[in-house]
Each structure stands twice: as structure tokens, then as C-alpha cells.
Amino acid sequence: MSKKEKREQKIRENVKNVSLEDFEWLINQYGYIKMGGSHSVAVIKNTSYAYPRKNPMGQPYVKRLIEIIDNR
């Protein structure tokens, strides 16, 4: 298992404790980030998803990101 796969697995297994850095790393694996004011927008395929830039990331934001990735 590569480092990338391990990092993604760690995020998926513990959605309660995900840092902003890990959250944005996961976005960049599947899409890109549009920076804004207090919120940024993750763009994965044809789906846009706004999220607050705070550390650690809230559990609902992480779950929704994983759902978007799995359904792409």
C-alpha cells in the first residue's frame, strides 16, 4: 500500500479528526480547490462543494467529501 493510499485510508477511517491539510490533500487527489474568503470550494468532476477553512474539519464536511468522491 502506497503512502497516498494509507493517508486516504486514515482519513476515511477517522472522519472525526481530520486536519484542514489532510482534507485539502484529499480534494487535490480527485479535483481542485477554488480559494475564497472564509470558505473555499472543492471542485471534483462536475460537483462543487463549499467548505469552511477551519482546523480540524467538521465531521459532516468530511463525510460529504468522501460521498462525492465515491459517487464520481
Residue ranges and their predicted role:
Residues Q9-R12, R53-K54:
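Short histidine-centered catalytic/ligand-binding loop motif
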Residues V15-V18, V41-V43, V62:
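Extended aliphatic helical segments
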Residues L26-S48, K54:
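A short, structured beta-strand/loop element
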Residues M1-E8:
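A short, surface-exposed helix-loop junction/capping segment
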Residues S2, N46-R72:
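Long, intrinsically disordered, low-complexity Ser/Thr/Pro-rich regulatory/activation regions
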Residues E24, N28, M35, Q59, ...:
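General N-terminal targeting signals
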